[in-house]
């Protein structure tokens, strides 16, 4: 194999393909990145039996071929190269990378021992890359990180015709986002549970593409897989087994109090007051007509109080939240105005965004957050 490719193109492609390489591969070849040069294209692939990634870029190909090299090493080298065209060639058990006056020689791994990448499932539909990335980011923040509860580490993708609903929970908050897309089959109905971290990494990487193709396996080829493709990149991941708790009944539809606050001053106030909140201690919110009073700490230790303008419809209410979970939700609504809707101080509150103080709440994204019970 002998090829020539632009340094930035190579570095970006290698970083994408190598992102899911295992830190401790069960077999040495799984630490490798598979480079294949043919018909004016250089493809780079990785696979760890859970996640596969493949990207194709344009390259000048003098001699076609395939080589398997250490993915992390090639990623480090590609990132450090000067901004000059890069030549990659192979000679038996060695691969050579030349860029300007820099020259690297890498040992190759046995290509014949590398597993075949899983077949991409059939395309299910398409969604604009920015919409997909935004929706995933809004929902994945609520996914659990405890691997002993694998179901809660996933994002649930539910497809009903032209509507897609993403949902995740760690038991302390529940995030749900709906958006429209273009399905291949207008009558499609499907559910999948995708590892949240893999979905986040994929969504970020595919934002540069105009459209993202979502490919969900049915029975047959690619069963138990979901695939994503866009901007010359494709990835598959194995689905998690199980399903999230039935959540639609958890979201209240009637409220005793609804508070409306400008998001930016609310966020800044929570951050300041939380400075005195020790680990896992809550920030207390007291809503009255025209004002929100935030408090944290205790009289025995450091204490903080701040007042923020707020509109309140309904009864006055005092409630407490984990400040990190509250800030996550306020960041995720991505709106200038936040709406918090309450039933009681011991029941979950519903956070959503408004484009303006006097506008209706955006129903596309909902963030349900459990309150922290206060002693006494």
From Swiss-Prot:
GO terms for molecular function: 3'-5' exonuclease activity; DNA binding; DNA-directed DNA polymerase activity. Signal peptide: none annotated. The keyword Phosphoprotein does not apply. Keywords: Cytoplasm, DNA replication, DNA-binding, DNA-directed DNA polymerase, Nucleotidyltransferase, Transferase. One of its GO terms (cellular component) is cytoplasm. GO terms for biological process: DNA strand elongation involved in DNA replication. SUPFAM superfamilies: DNA clamp. InterPro entries: DNA_clamp_sf, DNA_polIII_beta, DNA_polIII_beta_C, DNA_polIII_beta_cen, DNA_polIII_beta_N. It is found in: Cytoplasm. Its main location: cytoplasm. Belongs to the beta sliding clamp family. Forms a ring-shaped head-to-tail homodimer around DNA which binds and tethers DNA polymerases and other proteins to the DNA. The DNA replisome complex has a single clamp-loading complex (3 tau and 1 each of delta, delta', psi and chi subunits) which binds 3 Pol III cores (1 core on the leading strand and 2 on the lagging strand) each with a beta sliding clamp dimer. Additional proteins in the replisome are other copies of gamma, psi and chi, Ssb, DNA helicase and RNA primase. Confers DNA tethering and processivity to DNA polymerases and other proteins. Acts as a clamp, forming a ring around DNA (a reaction catalyzed by the clamp-loading complex) which diffuses in an ATP-independent manner freely and bidirectionally along dsDNA. Initially characterized for its ability to contact the catalytic subunit of DNA polymerase III (Pol III), a complex, multichain enzyme responsible for most of the replicative synthesis in bacteria; Pol III exhibits 3'-5' exonuclease proofreading activity. This is Beta sliding clamp. The gene is dnaN.
